[in-house]
Amino acid sequence: AAAPF
C-alpha cells in the first residue's frame, strides 16, 4: 500500500 502523500 502506498503512503497517502
UniProtKB/Swiss-Prot annotation:
Q: Where does tissue-level expression of this protein occur? A: Main peptide from the subesophageal ganglia.
Task: State what protein this is by name.
Answer: Subesophageal ganglion pentapeptide
